[in-house]
Structures are given as structure tokens and as C-alpha cells.
A protein has these predicted regions:
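Conserved glycine(s) of the Walker
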Residues: 204
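A noncatalytic interaction/capping subdomain that flanks phosphate/NTP-handling catalytic cores
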Residues: 46-196, 201, 211-220, 228-335
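Hydrophobic alpha-helical signal peptides and transmembrane signal-/tail-anchor segments
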Residues: 2-26, 35-40
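Hydrophobic positions on the alpha1 helix immediately C-terminal to the Walker A/P-loop
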Residues: 208
Length: 335
């Protein structure tokens, strides 16, 4: 309620300011003043909202009447009442800075039907050009300082895809040195503990979560695509819900201690085994977001991964998409 009241108050004040400004200058035919007025309208009518995910706060700045806010419904459970310490601020702009001298660093794409992300270095900053598919044209431009603290982005395509991608990437990059991993995983909760299911796209992570929910009493879904793992100050490992949950609308602002992490593999026979520390490290390594060639980011991801696999039991599950696989996994990882 406090956030809504403040936003409403700022909206009224900004509109009043613009109205008075127009009354004062309407009769004066001065082009420069009208240009300045348009600039003020844009600045004063912008809206800033703060969100908190896994204990990390970030801000989004967009025009207050922009349709893009309609795509922020998944973020509403994560609204924060004040700024606090922000890990990043992302602002939507109509015009990007000049990037003509950009130098390509790398291109990431996990398949023809997956987003393509091109990373450039440009005037001491990072520039990301993002397309929704491998062969699709660029639809999002994102430029950020090297610390991933201040970002500007321009959207040319789908607002839902663009906003989700920009904020998810910024969150992953900005938290890489903060004992935090943005995972590619489905998470099911049972008896106050959370169980993460890892695996390549199409392996059956969501299916396995649903098998637990449908066959084992008292299970519920926390997140179906991008939960957040965090090593807490006391050394414990907790998993948090996030606004990013893939095709399943599951946006829970809650967190649980991690009971186990399970790497899934499709097979003709159900079989499970405990992973060694090295195996667990590798299994986790391919399941979280971040650029490994940026040394500071890689060091942070490595340190967090080490802490997690040294604390949380990790397993490999060869499985069929059936109830027997769910029971085998549940009975093993909850012992």
C-alpha cells in the first residue's frame, strides 16, 4: 500500500508540474522551450519500481504509462517498499548511446529455438544484443557498466521476452560475486525442504516435479525454470523463488533450505546414485547463468558453486517419466 500511495502521489505531482509548465509557456512560441518541455515530460513521468529477489534489490525505470508495465505482473510478489542497497538499476530508453565502435566478444545460443545473445565491449562498457531465436533479428539492446550496476535497454520486439531477458541477465551478472546462483532448474518443496532438479532442456525437469506433486502427498512447486540458490551468512544454502519461471506461471516470493540437488538423465531404467564432489561441481557448473570468461564473475561463481556442493548432497537420477522414478528419488534424497 505504501508503494502504491507514493507512486500515485508522484504521478499527480508530475502531472501538475507539467500542466503549470504548459500554462506558463503555451503562449510563447519558442521551439527550444517546447523541446525542453517534451524532455521534462519524459523525465518527470518516468516510474521507478524496486524489487527484491533472494534478498537482492534492483530497480526498473520506465515511462509510467508504458504498456511494458503490464508485462511486470510476475514481479509484483517481489515488490519492495524502499530502495535499500540496489544491485542494479535498469532503465528503458528510446535511443541507445552510440555503439559504432563495438568489438564482439562472444555469441551464446543453446539451439535454433533458443535466444541468441551477442556480447560486445564498447567504450568501457558491455553491450548485449539479444534475439529471441538463433536466426531472428535483434530485438533487445542492453548496455551496462562493467560492474553490471547501471544499465540502459531498448526494446524492439516482444515486451515480455525483452523485459524478462534483460532483468534475468542483469540479476545473474550483478549477483555473481554475492554467493548467489541463478539456476536452470525446477524446484519442488516437501516437508519444509526444497529439492532442485537439473538437466538439459527437454530432459524432463518439469515433468519430474509434477510426478512428485501428483504422487507424493504434500509436495508443491516453488519455481519451474529459474530459481535462485544463495549461500547465507551462516553457511547454509537456501533456494528462492523468482519472477522467472519459464512457461509455468509460478512466482513465489518464498525460500527454503535445500534438501538435495538431483541431475536428471532420460533412461530406460530408473537408477539413482550419490555424486562425488567433482561430479557435483560439474553438474552444477552447466546449470547456472554467467559469463565464465569474465574473471571476476567466474571467480564468484566458482566460489559459490564450491560452497554449495560441499554442503548440499547431489545425486544423478537415470529415469523414466513415471511415478516409480519419483518414489525412487524421493525415498533416496530424503533419507
Amino acid at each position: 500500500m505504501v508503494v502504491e500511495f507514493v507512486e500515485a502521489l508522484l504521478f499527480v505531482v508530475s502531472r501538475l508540474f507539467v500542466f503549470l509548465f504548459i500554462l506558463s509557456y503555451f503562449s510563447k512560441k519558442n521551439v527550444q522551450r517546447y523541446v525542453f518541455l517534451a524532455y521534462l515530460c519524459t523525465k518527470f513521468c518516468s516510474m521507478k519500481r524496486v524489487y527484491q529477489v533472494a534478498g537482492h534489490r534492483f530497480a526498473v525505470v520506465m515511462p509510467d504509462n508504458h504498456l511494458a508495465w503490464n508485462e511486470m505482473k510476475p514481479y509484483e510478489p517481489f515488490l519492495a517498499e524502499n530502495d535499500g542497497d540496489l544491485i542494479f538499476t535498469a532503465e528503458m530508453v528510446d535511443v541507445m548511446p552510440d555503439t559504432s565502435d563495438k568489438q564482439k566478444i562472444t555469441v551464446n545460443c543453446d539451439g535454433a529455438d533458443m535466444p541468441r545473445i551477442e556480447l560486445y565491449e564498447c567504450q568501457g562498457q558491455w553491450l548485449l544484443e539479444i534475439a529471441p531465436l538463433l536466426e531472428a533479428p535483434v530485438r533487445v539492446y542492453l548496455i551496462t557498466d562493467k560492474a553490471f550496476h547501471t544499465a540502459k535497454f531498448r526494446v524492439l520486439g516482444s515486451m515480455r521476452f525483452s523485459l524478462g531477458t534483460v532483468l534475468m541477465l542483469m540479476f545473474a551478472f550483478a549477483t555473481a560475486k554475492k554467493n548467489t546462483l541463478l539456476m536452470h532448474s525446477s524446484v519442488t518443496v516437501k516437508d519444509g525442504k526444497a529439492y532442485l532438479f537439473l538437466g538439459k532442456s527437454g530432459t524432463g525437469k518439469s515433468t519430474h516435479s509434477q510426478l512428485w506433486i501428483n504422487t507424493i502427498e504434500g509436495c508443491e512447486l516453488l519455481n519451474d525454470d529459474n530459481p535462485v540458490l544463495r549461500v547465507m551468512d551462516d553457511g547454509s544454502v537456501r533456494v528462492f523463488g523468482s519472477p522467472w519461471s519459464g512457461k509455468t506461471p509460478c512466482y513465489h516470493n518464498s525460500d527454503y533450505p535445500v534438501g538435495a540437488i538431483v541431475d536428471l538423465h532420460q533412461a530406460k531404467v530408473n537408477k539413482i546414485r550419490r555424486l562425488s564432489l567433482l561430479e557435483a561441481y560439474v553438474s552444477m557448473y552447466v546449470s547456472f547463468s554467467g559469463y565464465r570468461f569474465i574473471k571476476e564473475m567466474a571467480d564468484g561463481l566458482h566460489a559459490t558453486n564450491e560452497k554449495i556442493v560441499g554442503t548440499v548432497p547431489c545425486y544423478s537420477l537415470d529415469c523414466l517419466p513415471n511415478a516409480d522414478a519419483a518414489y525412487l528419488c524421493y525415498n533416496t534424497v530424503t533419507q
